Structure formats: C-alpha cells, structure tokens
Amino acid sequence: MSHSDPLFDEVPDRRGRNSLKWGKYEGRDVLPLWVADMDYRSPPQVIEVAKNLAEFGNFGYGKPSPALTELVIERMESLHDWQIQPNWLVWLPGMVCGFNIAIRAMGKEGDEVLSNIPVYPPFLMAPGNFGQNLAGVPMILEEARHTMDFDGLVSAISPQSKTFLFCHPHNPVGTQFTRHELERFAEFCLRYDLGVCSDEIHCDLLLDPGAQH
C-alpha cells in the first residue's frame, strides 16, 4: 500500500460504535491520539477473509497458517537481515500478553523488573501482575535525543533484579538505539545475569533515511 492508495481517502466515523479509542473522550472536543489504532478501512483482502469466515459460520480453534509463518521468515530476512527458524515463532493474540508471559517466566514474586522510563504504560503495570516490582530508570537527554542512562541502570541493580523489559525503537520517545548502545546494553545484561524481553513492535517505523533495525 502506498500513500496514494485510495484506501486512505475513506475514513469511517467510528464514534458511537463501541470504539475504545473514540469512546475514551466521547462528548469532548478531543482528538484521541492516545492509542495506536488507525481509522482507515481494513484492506479489501482482510475484509474478504473475514466475510468468508463469518459466512462459513463456525469459529472453532484454528492453527497458525504455514503461509503466514513463511511470510514472517522472509520479512525478517529481507528487512532486517535476520535468518529465523519456524519453531522460533510463538503466535500470541497481542504484544502485551507476550511480555506479561515473559515476566512471569523469568521471575518470581518479589523479584524486580528493570525498564527505561518513560515507557509504554502497560510496561509499568505488568510486573505487579505477578507480585514483582518495577525498577524504572529515567532516560537521559543528549543533544535532543533520549538514550539509556547506563550509570543509572547499574545503580538500580539489586539482588532481586531478574528481568529487563526493553523497548526498541523506544515508545514513546522514538529513540532507535545505535549498535554501540545495544552492544553496551547486552554487556550490561550479561554482567548482571538479566533475562531480556524486547518489545520491537515498531521496528518498521523508522523515519531516518537509510536506518535499519
């Protein structure tokens, strides 16, 4: 899809249609830009598949499509020069449940989860879902760019530190960490034996020309 696709000329009015995005500030003069939820119609191909499923009339359990798995493998290689295997992929209904599962798997009640802040709000709530504590380390601003405060990260380490909940590109500040920063981050996690859960859902939204995730 390109920016000239006619799909972008049609914007359905979702107000009054059980929309989480539009319902949050319903009745107020507010544009709801608080959530990653587009207002364009879905592509015709997606609508057609949904129609066919509805007309079939049975919504029993399914399994991941081999074609979709292959497409993800091809995409990782073509966009990110990363060769992955089919058995590395675990299909989940959403990213938030994914990092909640990771926190539960890598720690226990009373453990600590480190993260750079500010950050996507569900990061802040996830550790508490399992009796764990968030150790948020403020990012630092250098030449109009937010980056990790490695001294602050070291200071935040405790015997209870077990997991690092990482976000790259970082939401909400938009930082795409450099290779040097990522290598330094990896060394930090190895030194303190931290499991890493990395949310990279925005990896295709790179605005700098020539940038690669």
Predicted features and spans:
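A short helix->loop->beta-strand "cap" motif at the edges of active sites that frequently abuts
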Residues: 132, 191-194
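Conserved core of the PLP fold type I
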Residues: 59-187, 204-205, 210-213
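Aromatic/pi-system hotspot detector in well-structured domains
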Residues: 29, 177, 190
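Short glycine-centered segments of the SAM/dcSAM-binding site in methyltransferase folds
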Residues: 112, 194-195
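N-terminal small-domain helix-loop-helix segment of the aminotransferase-like
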Residues: 2-94, 101
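Structured helix-beta-strand junction loops
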Residues: 53-56, 159-160, 191-192
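Hydrophobic "anchor" residues on beta-strands that sit immediately upstream
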Residues: 163, 195-196
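Walker B catalytic acidic pair
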Residues: 200
